[in-house]
Structure formats: C-alpha cells, structure tokens
Amino acid sequence: MSSQPNKNLKVFDNPNIERNFIIQINMPEFTCLCPKTGQPDFATLYLEYIADKVCIELKSLKMYIWSYRSKGEFHEAVTNKILDDLIQISNPRFMRLKAIFNVRGGIYTTIIAEYQQKNWTFKTKIDLQYQG
C-alpha cells in the first residue's frame, strides 16, 4: 500500500444501509497553497455525512487530503472541489464540509458547503454540528 499523497478515494459497503447515521470526521492538518502568494494555508476540515450505499475509507481520505499540500487553491474552490469529489465517489444521502482556515493577514475564513440527495429528507430534525 502506498503512503504517498494521491487522489484515489476508496469506499466500502455501508454496514447499516437501512439506518440514517451520522459520520463525523475531523481533519486538523489540511494544507494547501495560496494561489496568489504560494504561501501555505492551513485549515481544519470537518466532514459530516449520512451514507447511502457506501462509506468513505479513512486511509484513502487521508491520502486524498494530503494531495492538496502542493496545490494552489482559493479557500472557496478547494472546499467545494473536495466536497464534489467526495460526493462523486460516495453519493451520500447528505454531506457537509466545513473548512476553517487559520488566520491570514488578520482575516479568518470559514467555508461551509453541503449536498443533499434529491427527494431525500431528514425523517427527524438532526443537528449536524461536529462535536469533536
């Protein structure tokens, strides 16, 4: 198995497909580069999702996240790109990605992007606030 950063996301079968359960993943070491200055940008990513048929395999997610270390991306673009890639590989019932970027020039940036399958609704009110 490779320990090199790569974009090869993997999934496994949802062990409880009949149930809506929330998966929360905290990624405190996200790094990309500012496309204007080339300086590193650091963020904590909070992923929350309700799987449908498959779940995202964590080691592949780690390698995928690491692959952004040398990429120049705006905060808004990289957050939405990551969400798009995760949706494409897993087709979740619901997914939210929150990216909290460290201060840069006295400004903090938080980007929240989310997705919900068509015709799928929460059966009960669910507060998807990460409790990490």
Swiss-Prot record:
Substrate binds at I56, E57, L58, H75, E76. Keywords: Cytoplasm, NADP, Oxidoreductase, Queuosine biosynthesis. One of its GO terms (molecular function) is preQ1 synthase activity. It is an enzyme of class 1 (oxidoreductase). Its main location: cytoplasm. GO terms for biological process: queuosine biosynthetic process; tRNA modification. It holds the Pfam family QueF. InterPro entries: GTP-CH-I_C/QueF, NADPH_dep_7-cyano-7-deazaG_red, QueF, QueF_type1. It is found in: Cytoplasm. Gene3D superfamilies: 3.30.1130.10. Pathway: tRNA modification; tRNA-queuosine biosynthesis. It catalyses: 7-aminomethyl-7-carbaguanine + 2 NADP(+) = 7-cyano-7-deazaguanine + 2 NADPH + 3 H(+). GO terms for cellular component: cytoplasm. The active site is at C34, D41. Its EC number is 1.7.1.13. Belongs to the GTP cyclohydrolase I family. QueF type 1 subfamily. Catalyzes the NADPH-dependent reduction of 7-cyano-7-deazaguanine (preQ0) to 7-aminomethyl-7-deazaguanine (preQ1). This is NADPH-dependent 7-cyano-7-deazaguanine reductase. It comes from Vesicomyosocius okutanii subsp. Calyptogena okutanii (strain HA).
